[in-house]
Amino acid sequence: MNIISVGVNHKTAPIEIRERIALSEVQNKELVTDLVSSGLASEAMVVSTCNRTELYVVPGMPEVNCDYLKDYIISYKNARNAVRPEHFFSRFYCGTARHLFEVSCAIDSLVLGEGQILGQVKNAYRIAAEVGTAGILLTRLCHTAFSVAKKVKTRTKLMEGAVSVSYAAVELAQKIFSNLSMKKVLLIGAGETGELAAKHMYAKNARNIVITNRTQSKAEALAEELGTNRVLPYESYKEHLHEFDIIITAVSTKEYILNAAEMQQSMAKRRLKPVIILDLGLPRNVDPEVGALQNMFLKDIDALKHIIDKNLERRRAELPKVKAIIDEELVAFGQWLNTLKVRPTIVDLQSKFLEIKEKELERYRYKVSEEELRRMEHLTDRILKKILHHPIKMLKAPVDTADNIPSKVNLVRNIFDLEEPNQSLQ
């Protein structure tokens, strides 16, 4: 029994290729169902995100190998004119397991340690389970991957520290003010960057968020999504600057929208109570001289990127610990995988000795009392258990490579004169 995987990701193919191969949830279900119903695979699962489309398969026919699956996906997506086999990676046996473990704990991600990929892998398994294409092997593989990700999260610091500008801004605000639930926040700009910052703020328990934007309807839509319903007209927000403890700017402009004179007036009204200004604009939205004012903490994108770089450096330092966890789980998974290969021989061995026992006991069934027969049966069961203990232990013992398994199996089958294994048990 083997498991193979092929796919495209940010390491193997540019974005235009990844877009051509990407699968919707409907296509995901259709692809894995077709593979299994046709007998090409006994199990199948697809992990499809914005950065990767990866197919995991337990082959059902000898001709189903990595090259076959690459061609299958290209054909399914009608992408032969743009996508080539060279755009794909290939993995098999424990290499497939290692890859999924690395994907699940986010060391194979574009952003090291990002938190979304585990949920995406879980969704891939959910889809396969729903349509019935996740069998014993994929189920064990996925649950081991989930366990790896959990251990990485609890035993390492791989996922600690902000690695996006908007999240770094919020993390910095929390370090300065500690309890954001008590602070009043003004968001200037409701575009993508501002929206992310507002959502991160909300996730950190900031509930008093006021939004202003050139297009008021956009500010109102974001406010409604956050559940604040608090919006200031863009023309008049400067009249209220003194009311806010945290100001986030994220607008597209060539001119500073806040200058030192305006903020000095605001600070006077606040009686010098501290203010954090997080300038997420590019070009900058806030005059750098604002940062020189008393109790005014101004951080722009460059300052935040310095924080991000430090956090990424700390995450990279955790990689040896992460890889040690993966190696540990990979050994256990490989040993379990090997037991599947020897299971038919173990079943046949036990069946043969059980048959011998039954035949021999049958010869004495009418020659002894029921009590004596019961004792004989109990005795032979104990003898058989001891006789079979070492052969079964040897079959289950870890091996250096999967190539060593057939030699062990053949040795046992020849010694005990077992018939060809039942393929349905493999």
Swiss-Prot record:
**Function text:** Catalyzes the NADPH-dependent reduction of glutamyl-tRNA(Glu) to glutamate 1-semialdehyde (GSA).
Short name of one Pfam family for this protein?
Answer: Shikimate_DH
Q: Which NCBIfam families match?
A: hemA
Q: In the UniProt entry for this protein, what further remark is given in the free-text comments?
A: During catalysis, the active site Cys acts as a nucleophile attacking the alpha-carbonyl group of tRNA-bound glutamate with the formation of a thioester intermediate between enzyme and glutamate, and the concomitant release of tRNA(Glu). The thioester intermediate is finally reduced by direct hydride transfer from NADPH, to form the product GSA.
Pathway as given in its UniProt record: Porphyrin-containing compound metabolism; protoporphyrin-IX biosynthesis; 5-aminolevulinate from L-glutamyl-tRNA(Glu): step 1/2; Porphyrin-containing compound metabolism; chlorophyll biosynthesis
Q: Which reaction does it catalyse?
A: (S)-4-amino-5-oxopentanoate + tRNA(Glu) + NADP(+) = L-glutamyl-tRNA(Glu) + NADPH + H(+)
Report residues binding NADP(+): G189, A190, G191, E192, T193, G194
The name this protein carries in UniProt is Glutamyl-tRNA reductase
CDD domains per the record? Answer: NAD_bind_Glutamyl_tRNA_reduct
Q: Which GO terms describe its molecular function?
A: glutamyl-tRNA reductase activity; NADP binding
Q: What domain comment accompanies this record?
A: Possesses an unusual extended V-shaped dimeric structure with each monomer consisting of three distinct domains arranged along a curved 'spinal' alpha-helix. The N-terminal catalytic domain specifically recognizes the glutamate moiety of the substrate. The second domain is the NADPH-binding domain, and the third C-terminal domain is responsible for dimerization.
The record lists substrate as bound by T49, C50, N51, R52, S109, E114, G115, Q116, Q120
Under Gene3D superfamilies, the record lists: Glutamyl-tRNA reductase, N-terminal domain, NAD(P)-binding Rossmann-like Domain
Give the EC number. Answer: 1.2.1.70
Q: Which PANTHER family does this chain map to? A: GLUTAMYL-TRNA REDUCTASE
Membership in a protein family: Belongs to the glutamyl-tRNA reductase family.
Gene Ontology annotations of biological process type: chlorophyll biosynthetic process; protoporphyrinogen IX biosynthetic process from glutamate
Keywords of the record = Chlorophyll biosynthesis, NADP, Oxidoreductase, Porphyrin biosynthesis
